[in-house]
Amino acid sequence: MYIICTYADITTIRRFNTMKQFMDKDFLLSTDTAKALFHDYAENMPILDYHCHINPKEIAEDRKFENITQVWLGGDHYKWRQMRSNGVDEYYITGGASDREKFQKWAETLTKAIGNPLYHWSHLELQRYFDYHGVLNGDTAEEVWNICNAKLADDSMTVRNIIKKSGVTLICTTDDPVDSLEYHKQIAEDPTFDVQVLPAWRPDKAMNIEKPDYTDYHAKLSEVSGVEVKSFEGLKEALVKRMAFFDSMGCRASDHALEYVMYKPATAEEIEAIFAKRLGGAALTKEEELKFKTAFMTFVGKEYNKLGWAMQLHYGAKRDNNVFRYNQLGPDTGYDCINTYSSSAEMADFLNSMNATDELPKTIIYSLNPIDNAAIGTVLGCFQDSTAVGKIQQGSAWWFNDHKVGMTDQMTSLANLGLLGNFIGMLTDSRSFLSYTRHEYFRRIMCELLGKWVENGEYPADMKTLGGMVRDISYNNAVRYFGFKLDTVEK
């Protein structure tokens, strides 16, 4: 008997003999060194999520989700953007469509997301939390919907159990100075839940003097602090009191969302005059706004140094560009983009102003523009000292950059210009409790990068040293850097 094979048949046979399985155990790992580093060192490390946007109330109340749409699409503007790009009507995104209809539209959109991290994240979450190893698309949406919802109905999939299942030891939420932190307190006092949930200080509303509701915010700050905010000195006093409260609740980090890092110094008298002008209802010039924000950031930075907090600077986003949709849906709904203005010179001046008086805190710098990687890498080296290992850090690839290429580029640039071994690693920056797989995604990409360097002869195949480095970047460095009350994992 003769079997006649066409060229296409032979090509297909060869391809299936060599092609990797879809997102198998060695997903993103192409070398033996990368596989060993991930499976032997990175894979089972705990997770320390030092920056995210999850709601502590949902942890305190141990929320149980009714369906996968609530988990995936309730507030995920990453997914919303792609659904809009696929021509999906807003009714099925943030509108009144049923959860099942919204999930269907997302499944149909996901098919086209080849090369997008959402494709990988979604399938990692399906594998790790729902034991589904198939492919989500429009045709399989009903099957996946039923599988996920059946799992979510089980008590093992409450918010707290998801966190424990993920291997999380500590979470830092994002909190305003006026927040009561009542849910953090409730969690901390619950002996049945041993994951630390700590606040992180986010004082953007106290700084953004140009916003129309700025004076209204000061009324809230005055109430919770017991300090009447009628001057910049009063504002500083109120903030110091709230910082002390946050510190007592375990806070070890601040976070700032900046359009860019500014540095426009002014005298104390000028700042008081600018503050009084704004409280009087007058509009400020751009120069006055920048002077005030410079004074604000310099003040809080020095206070962070006293407290031993780390200062996180997230900059480079131009937000709320679609005014029509902003008026309908509000902020954080998927209408932001990268701001191409480079502020590395001002950033260096800003850091130098605190360093000159020995008051520069530990600082983590994130730019949304990947072009800034090298500039940040060189700024880091200007302000390192012996007070902390890797005192000034470049943050992990952020938002529009937390994909395979973005993470690889960020770590490569950091390695080229600094010490990758001191990097504090990944964070979710997410509003979803299923996003902890992003730590796995990052670790796979990191191990692939290190593995290629080793197998190319660029670094010794010393698995003890490499394994320690992988563990450190995955978890230990962040424990040490922030000073959290956690044990490191050395073996």
Predicted regions located by residue number:
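Hard-cation-handling environments
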Residues: 322
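Metal-cofactor-binding active-site regions of metalloenzymes
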Residues: 20-307, 359-361, 365-377, 381-491
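Divalent-cation-assisted or electrostatically stabilized phosphate/pyrophosphate-binding catalytic cores
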Residues: 341-347
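Short, Lys/Arg-enriched N-terminal segments with co-localized hydrophobic residues
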Residues: 1-18
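Metal/cofactor-centered catalytic core regions of large enzymes
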Residues: 288, 333-337
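C-terminal amphipathic alpha-helical interaction region
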Residues: 311-313
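Short, basic/hydrophobic alpha-helical segments
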Residues: 350-356
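Short glycine/proline- and charge-enriched loop/turn segments
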Residues: 326-334
